[in-house]
UniProtKB/Swiss-Prot annotation:
GO cellular component, one term: endoplasmic reticulum
Keyword check for Cell division: yes
Name of the protein in question: Polarized growth protein rax2
Annotated transmembrane regions: 1106-1126
Extracellular side: 28-1105
Species per Swiss-Prot/TrEMBL record: Schizosaccharomyces pombe (strain 972 / ATCC 24843)
Keyword terms of this UniProt record: Cell cycle, Cell division, Cell membrane, Glycoprotein, Membrane, Signal, Transmembrane, Transmembrane helix
Gene this chain is encoded by: rax2
Superkingdom of source: Eukaryota
Function description: Controls cell polarity, through the G1 phase of mitosis, via regulation of for3 localization. Required for actin cable formation where it directs the spatial distribution of the actin cables.
Quaternary data: Interacts with for3 and tea1.
Residues exposed to the Cytoplasmic side: 1127-1155
Length: 1155
C-alpha cells in the first residue's frame, strides 16, 4: 500500500480547488436508467423487422446500418457472393415472387425471376437456396395435383439475362440442398426416386433434324428420314408406281444410325397395296437381309430381294438380321403387277427404328398439309442455309449470311404429356475448321400451351460432337392448336449452325433413403450427374440436418441430424474413400442441427447435453478437433438448443476481431467459471481467448443475429442477419450524458467493470468532490431477483467493491457522505413496509435507521435540502409520532420526524419541488383531500412556518398530478409543468402554471395519451452538450410516442416541438423504457464559455460580471492564504516523522483496484 501524508493530500486538493475556479464551471451530468440494453442518441431509427433475414453494413467506428431496404413479408432470403459482389434472392411465399437484388454499393438493381404472373413454370415455389461456392441460386417447385413431386430449377445470378434451367425432379419432397467443396450438391428430403437427366441411352421420344429444299441428293423422290415432308403427287399421299412399276425412297440421316427395323403402314381405304420391296445400302448397292414375322403362317422368316408385304394388317415390321449402321438407306418398292396407270399403292407411312430406342424418328408423309392429323415430326426454317463442308464429322447446315434474319423450328411427334429432356446436337467444329465462323444461338423451348418458352443461350463453337441440354421438365403433348416445339434463333450477328434435336423421356433412379449427391457442373453445355456414394445410403435424408465438407483438400464430409446406427449417434464422418466412421464417445446424445467448420476445429450445435456415452458435458454446443479427435465444451455451454453457427467479424475500436457466432433458443451462455451472460438468442465465442463475449463489451448493441458474408468486397463489412433494432451503444440499463462536449462515450466506464450478468438499477454520488459512486446492481438467480450495493470509480474501469445486500427495488438517498438505501416492500397482506439502511462512506460503517423505519406506506418522491439534514418524503405515507400524511420530513442530525401543521385527511404526493433557491418553500404535487372534503392537486409547504396550504391556480388543475417540474426565471418568477390525469375523462394532460397562479394547457407534438412519462425535467443548454440547442429545454423520459408515431425513450422539447434524445431498446429489440433520471454535480474537464445573465433586480442594474469579478478576487485572496499555510506545512513536514494515513481516499481507491 502506498504511503500518503495529509500534507500532500491538502496540497493536491488546493491545486484542484484553484484550477477548478479558474478554468471550469459546475455542470450537471445526467444518467438515464431503465429497462434497456442498447440505445441511439438523437435518433429513433430501428431496423425493418418484416424480413426473416436482412443485410447490414458496419463502418470502422462500429456503427451498424441497414444495407437493403425491402418491404416484403413472409419472405425467405438467401445470398450468393461472387468476385466481390453480393447477390440477394428474396422469395415472397405469399405473392409467389422471387426477386434478385444486386449492386448495393453502386446502383442497386432489382430483377424479377419468378412471379405468379409469369406463366413459364408450373407449380408453387416452395423454397430457395443459394450456392456459397458458385453464383447459382436454386428454387424448388411443388404441385397441388402432384403432392409427392418436386422440381428443382437453378439460374446464374450474375447474368443480366436470367436463364432458368431445370436441374432435377424428385418423387417426394425436398428439405435441403447442401453445397459442398467438390462442386457438388447434396439433396436431402423424403423422396424415393430422382431423375438424373444425364443418361445418354434413355427412352427416346423423338429425334429429328433440319431439312432443306436443297437436299443432298438431286432425286426428287429422296426423303430425309429424320424430317417429314409430304409427297404432293397425289392428294391422298399414296405412292403411284404405275408409270415405272418402281418407287425408290432414298432416306438419309445427319448422324450414324444403328438401324433396328422398318415399319410399313397400310392405307386402309386402298384396294391395292405395295406387294414387294428391298432394302439397299446406297454406298455399295448391296441388298440388306431382313427378318419378319409372317402373319399367315405365324413363323419367322428371312428375305432380302422382293420381301413380301401383306395388306390385311395395319402395319408390318422387318428387322435387320445382321445389323446395319449407316447415315443412309434406300427402299425399293414394287407393285403386284396388276395396277393400272391410275391405281395407287395403299402404303401410307414408313418408319425407321433405332436399336435400343423405345420410340422412333419418322418419315410418315402425314403432316397437316396432306390432310392427316399430324402425328409426325417435322422441321421448318426461314433464311438461307448451305451444306457443311466435306470434312465435317456429320452432314449439317450452316446459315449462309451472318446477321440475316433466320430461324429453325423442330416439331417432335409427342402425343401425350410427359416429363422429358430436350437436347441439341452440335457437330464438332475442329473436323472442318469452322470454329471461328460459329457464334451462339438462342434456343426457345415451347413446352406447354399458353406458357412462355424456356430460353437458353448456347455456344456453338464446340470442338467435338456433343449434346447440349436445352430444357428438362414437363412436355405437353398434342392439344388444340398446340404442339411442343423448339425454335433456334441466331444471337446477335452469329452464323447459326443447325443439325438435329432429340427428346428424351426422363428416367428415374431409385433413392430409397432420400439423400443423393449431384455434380453441379457450371458448364452450360454439360448435364449434371449423380455421384455414387454407397456409404451414404445407410442414412435417411429426412434425418439429415447438415452436411459439410472439411477443409482438408479431400472430399470428406461431416453428416449430422437425428439418427442412431452402428456408426454412432446423430453425427457420422465419411472420408474421401466413401467409408463411414463414428465419432469418439459414441457421438452426441441429442439431435445436431448445425455444423460450422473453421480450420482444424468444427463446431456443433443442437439439442444435445453430453457426448453419446455421457462422459463429457457440453450443453447444446461442442467443438471437435479433427487433429486430436477430441470433444470439448465452450465454457459451460448455453441454456437452450443452438440452431445456427457461423462467423462474425466486427469492427471493435477500429480493428477487426473475428468470432464464432451462435444462434438459437437460448438466453444465457455460461463461462468456464459458471457465470451466466445474458443474450437474446445470439452469442459470440472468441476462439483466441476461449471465452464468451458479452454484447456491451463490443461497443454496440445487437438485438438479433449477424453472420459474415464471405467473398464480399473487403472494403466493406457486410452481414446477413436479423436485427429487430439497430443501436450504436450497448449497455446495462444506463445511458450517461456529460456536460463536457468532448465526452461523447455515453457509456460510463464502470459498466464494463461489472460482470455481464449484473444489471444496473440505480446510481448515486455520495462522495463529495471525487469520482466514487454507489450502484445498485441486480441479478437473476433461480428465477429470483437479488441485489447488492457496490462502490465503483466513475473514471476508471476498476472492479467494483460489494458493500451490502439490498432489494431489487431499492433506491438511494444521498446526504453528503451518507448513503441511505431504502425499499418499499409489500408483505403477503399487501401492506407496504419500508426498509432503510444507512451507510457512512467516510467511516465505512452502518448507521442507525430505527427512527426512519417508522415511516409507513409507499414512497414516491424524495429530495434533500442544501444542509443535508432534512429529508423530504412524498407518497402514500404516514408516520405516527409526527402525524404527517402523504408528506413527511425527517431531520437526520436529530434522527426525528418533524411535526407539520395541516388539515389533511388523506394525501398522496407524487412530486416535491423547491420553489426557489432560498429553500424556504416547496410545491407538493399529487392528490390531497382536506377535512372539508375539498380536493386539491397542488399544495405549497412553507418551511419557515411549517405549514401546508393551497396555492394560487390549483383549483384550475383538471386532475391528480403524476409528475411536476419547475423552471425558475428569477427569484420570484417561475413556471411549473404539471403532468397528470383528468378526472372527467381519465385522459392525460400537460399544463403549465406560472408564479402568478395562471394555468394553461401546454401542447407538445407528441401523442400524450399513448406515451408513458416517468420523468419531466428542465435542463439548461450546457447540461447535455449533444443537444444542438442554445436554450433551456424540457426533457420527457419514459416511452414517448412522437407525432410521426415513432417511439423514443427520452425526448427534448423546445418551443413545444419535441425530438428524440434517447431511443433505447430491450434485449428483444422492443423499445426500452426510462424509469429514472439521475443528475450529478461534476467538474468539467475543459474550460467552458459562460454566457453573462442579467438580473431582474432594478437596484443593481448591472450585469453579473461584477459578481464574477468579485468572486475571482475572493478566490485569489483565499489562494494566497492557503499557499502561506502550505509553506508552513512544508517546513513542518521536512523536520517531522512521516506517518501513514490509512483511511484517506487514495488508499481506498487502491484497495478497490486490488479487489
Amino acid at each position: 500500500m502506498a504511503i500518503y501524508s495529509s500534507f500532500w493530500i491538502r496540497l493536491y486538493f488546493t491545486f484542484r480547488f484553484f484550477c477548478y475556479f479558474l478554468t471550469s464551471v459546475v455542470a450537471s451530468d445526467v444518467s438515464f436508467l431503465g429497462d434497456f440494453s442498447g440505445f441511439n442518441v438523437l435518433s429513433n431509427s430501428s431496423a425493418n423487422t418484416d424480413l426473416s433475414s436482412q443485410f447490414f453494413e458496419q463502418t470502422n467506428n462500429g456503427s451498424l446500418s441497414s444495407l437493403i431496404d425491402t418491404s416484403y413479408s413472409n419472405s425467405q432470403i438467401c445470398y450468393s457472393s461472387w468476385q466481390g459482389d453480393l447477390y440477394v434472392i428474396v422469395l415472397d411465399s405469399e405473392q409467389q415472387t422471387v426477386l434478385l437484388q444486386s449492386n448495393f454499393t453502386s446502383n442497386p438493381t432489382s430483377l424479377e425471376i419468378f412471379s405468379s404472373q409469369n406463366t413459364s413454370f408450373f407449380g408453387n415455389i416452395s423454397a430457395i437456396f443459394c450456392d456459397d461456392k458458385f453464383p447459382y441460386a436454386y428454387a424448388t417447385f411443388t404441385f397441388s395435383d402432384k403432392p409427392s413431386f418436386t422440381s428443382i430449377y437453378r439460374w446464374n445470378v450474375t447474368n443480366s439475362n436470367v436463364t432458368i434451367e431445370h436441374f432435377y425432379n424428385v418423387k417426394g419432397n425436398v428439405d435441403s440442398l447442401f453445397f459442398l467443396n467438390n462442386d457438388s450438391v447434396a439433396i436431402s428430403g423424403n423422396f424415393t426416386e430422382i431423375s438424373p437427366f444425364s443418361s445418354s441411352n434413355g427412352p427416346q421420344i423423338a429425334k429429328l433434324a433440319f431439312r432443306s429444299n436443297n437436299s443432298f441428293s438431286q432425286n426428287s423422290l429422296n426423303r430425309n428420314l429424320s424430317s417429314v415432308s409430304c409427297d404432293l403427287t397425289d392428294s391422298y399421299s399414296l405412292w403411284d408406281p404405275s408409270s415405272s412399276g418402281l418407287v425408290s425412297i432414298y432416306a438419309w440421316a445427319p448422324y450414324l444410325i444403328d438401324f433396328n427395323r422398318i415399319r410399313f403402314y397400310n392405307y386402309e381405304s386402298s384396294e391395292n397395296s405395295v406387294a414387294f420391296f428391298s432394302a439397299i445400302n446406297p454406298a455399295d448397292g448391296t441388298v440388306l437381309p431382313l427378318t419378319h414375322y409372317d402373319l399367315e403362317t405365324g413363323l419367322s422368316s428371312t428375305c432380302d430381294v422382293n420381301c413380301s408385304l401383306q395388306n390385311f394388317a395395319n402395319y408390318q415390321d422387318f428387322y435387320f438380321s445382321k445389323g446395319y449402321n449407316s447415315y443412309q438407306i434406300e427402299i425399293q418398292m414394287f407393285g403386284n403387277g396388276e395396277a393400272t396407270e391410275n391405281s395407287a399403292f395403299g402404303l401410307s407411312s414408313l418408319q425407321f427404328f433405332e436399336t435400343n430406342q423405345n420410340s422412333y424418328f419418322d418419315d410418315s408423309y402425314n403432316q397437316e398439309s396432306c390432310g392427316f392429323p399430324g402425328l409426325n415430326s417435322l422441321s421448318s426454317y426461314e433464311g438461307n442455309f448451305e451444306a457443311s463442308f466435306s470434312n465435317a464429322s456429320m452432314p449439317y447446315w450452316i446459315q449462309t449470311i451472318a446477321g440475316e434474319q433466320a430461324s429453325v423450328s423442330f416439331f417432335p411427334n409427342i402425343t401425350v404429356p410427359t416429363n422429358g429432356t430436350v437436347q441439341l446436337l452440335i457437330p464438332g467444329c475442329t473436323y472442318d475448321n469452322t470454329c471461328s465462323q460459329r457464334g451462339s444461338v438462342i434456343a426457345n423451348v415451347y413446352f406447354a400451351k399458353n406458357k412462355q418458352p424456356a430460353t437458353k443461350l448456347v455456344q456453338q463453337a464446340s470442338d467435338f460432337d456433343q449434346y447440349v441440354s436445352l430444357y428438362s421438365g414437363y412436355l405437353q403433348g398434342f392439344s388444340d392448336n398446340f404442339r411442343p416445339y423448339v425454335e433456334l434463333l441466331p444471337y446477335k450477328n452469329s452464323r447459326m449452325v443447325t443439325h438435329s434435336i432429340r427428346f428424351l423421356e426422363q428416367s428415374y433412379t431409385n433413392v430409397s433413403n432420400g439423400l443423393v449427391f449431384v455434380n453441379t457442373t457450371t458448364d452450360v453445355n454439360k448435364l449434371p450427374s449423380i455421384i455414387e456414394f454407397p456409404a451414404a445410403s445407410k442414412l435417411r435424408g429426412t434425418a439429415i440436418s447438415q452436411i459439410k465438407s472439411l477443409s482438408n483438400g479431400n472430399f470428406s464430409l461431416y453428416m449430422t441430424g437425428n439418427f442412431s446406427d452402428n456408426y454412432g449417434n446423430n453425427v457420422v464422418y465419411m472420408d474421401s474413400l466413401n467409408h463411414l466412421h463414428s465419432f469418439p464417445n459414441n457421438g452426441l446424445n441429442g439431435w445436431v442441427s448445425y455444423i460450422y467448420v473453421s480450420g482444424d476445429s468444427s463446431y456443433f450445435g443442437g439439442n444435445f447435453t453430453h457426448t453419446g456415452d455421457g462422459s463429457i458435458k457440453l450443453n447444446y454446443i461442442a467443438m471437435y478437433s479433427e487433429t486430436s479427435r477430441n470433444w470439448s465444451s465452450l465454457g459451460l455451454g448455453t441454456n437452450g438448443p443452438v440452431t445456427h453457427i457461423g462467423s462474425t467479424s466486427l469492427f471493435i475500436d477500429g480493428k477487426i476481431e473475428s468470432f464464432i457466432s451462435f444462434q438459437g433458443d437460448f438466453n444465457e451462455v455460461y463461462t468456464s467459471e459458471g457465470y451466466a451472460i445474458s443474450t437474446s438468442g445470439f452469442s459470440l465465442w472468441n476462439p483466441s481467448s476461449k471465452s464468451w463475449v458479452s454484447m456491451e463489451k463490443l461497443g454496440f448493441y445487437m438485438s438479433g443475429y449477424l453472420f459474415d458474408i464471405p467473398g464480399f468486397n473487403s472494403t466493406q463489412r457486410i452481414y446477413s442477419g436479423n436485427l429487430s433494432a439497430i443501436a450504436s451503444y450497448s449497455t446495462r440499463n444506463i445511458a450517461h450524458f456529460s456536460s463536457d462536449s468532448l465526452n461523447d462515450t455515453f457509456i460510463p466506464c464502470y459498466v464494463n467493470a461489472f460482470p455481464s450478468y449484473i444489471r444496473l438499477e440505480d446510481i448515486a454520488y455520495p462522495f463529495a468532490n471525487n469520482s466514487m459512486i454507489a450502484i445498485l446492481g441486480s441479478e437473476e438467480m433461480e428465477d429470483k431477483c437479488t441485489a447488492a450495493v457496490y462502490f465503483a470509480n466513475s473514471t476508471e474501469p476498476i472492479y467494483p467493491k460489494r458493500i451490502l445486500s439490498a432489494n431489487c427495488s431499492s433506491k438511494f438517498i444521498v446526504l453528503e457522505d451518507c448513503l441511505i438505501i431504502y425499499s418499499n416492500d409489500t408483505d403477503e397482506s399487501d401492506i407496504v413496509k419500508n426498509t432503510f439502511v444507512s451507510f457512512n462512506t467516510t467511516s465505512n460503517s452502518l448507521g442507525n435507521t430505527t427512527a426512519l423505519s417508522q415511516l409507513k406506506g409507499h414512497i414516491n418522491s424524495v429530495i434533500v435540502d442544501d444542509s443535508y439534514n432534512n429529508i423530504f418524503f412524498g407518497g402514500n405515507l404516514s408516520e405516527q409520532s409526527s402525524g404527517c400524511v402523504g408528506f413527511c420530513i425527517f431531520e437526520y442530525n436529530s434522527s426525528s420526524w418533524r411535526n407539520i401543521s395541516h388539515n389533511l385527511i388523506s394525501a398522496e404526493v407524487q412530486s416535491i419541488l423547491w420553489v426557489n433557491e432560498t429553500y424556504s418553500s416547496m410545491y407538493l404535487a399529487g392528490k390531497f383531500v382536506w377535512d372539508t372534503s375539498d380536493v386539491d392537486y397542488l399544495l405549497m409547504y412553507n418551511f419557515d412556518n411549517n405549514t401546508i396550504m393551497s396555492c394560487k391556480g390549483s383549483s384550475s388543475i383538471p386532475g391528480p398530478v403524476l409528475l411536476a417540474s419547475l423552471k425558475s426565471q428569477s427569484k420570484d418568477e417561475y413556471s411549473v409543468l404539471l403532468y397528470g390525469t383528468e378526472v372527467s375523462s381519465s385522459d392525460t394532460y400537460l399544463n403549465v402554471l406560472n408564479s402568478e397562479g395562471a394555468i394553461n394547457s401546454y401542447s407538445l407534438d407528441i401523442h400524450l395519451n399513448q406515451s408513458t412519462i416517468n420523468s419531466i425535467d428542465f435542463f439548461e443548454s450546457n447540461q447535455i452538450s449533444q443537444i444542438p440547442i442554445n436554450d433551456s429545454i424540457i426533457v420527457l423520459s419514459g416511452l414517448i410516442v412522437l407525432d410521426d408515431s415513432s417511439k423514443a425513450s427520452a425526448v427534448y422539447c423546445v418551443n413545444k416541438s419535441c425530438l428524440p434524445l434517447l431511443t433505447a431498446f430491450k434485449d428483444n429489440g422492443e423499445a426500452g423504457i426510462v424509469r429514472k433520471v439521475v443528475q450529478q454535480k461534476s467538474f468539467s474537464s475543459s474550460a467552458s464559455k459562460m454566457i453573462p445573465v442579467t438580473t431582474k433586480y432594478d437596484h443593481i442594474g448591472q450585469p453579473r460580471y461584477v459578481v464574477i469579478i468579485s468572486l475571482g478576487i475572493s478566490i485569489g485572496v483565499m489562494f494566497l492564504i492557503m499557499s502561506g499555510s502550505i509553506v508552513v506545512e512544508i517546513i513542518h513536514w521536512f523536520f517531522s516523522e512521516h506517518v501513514e494515513t490509512l483511511h484517506d481516499y487514495s488508499n481506498f481507491l487502491k484497495e478497490l483496484k486490488t479487489q
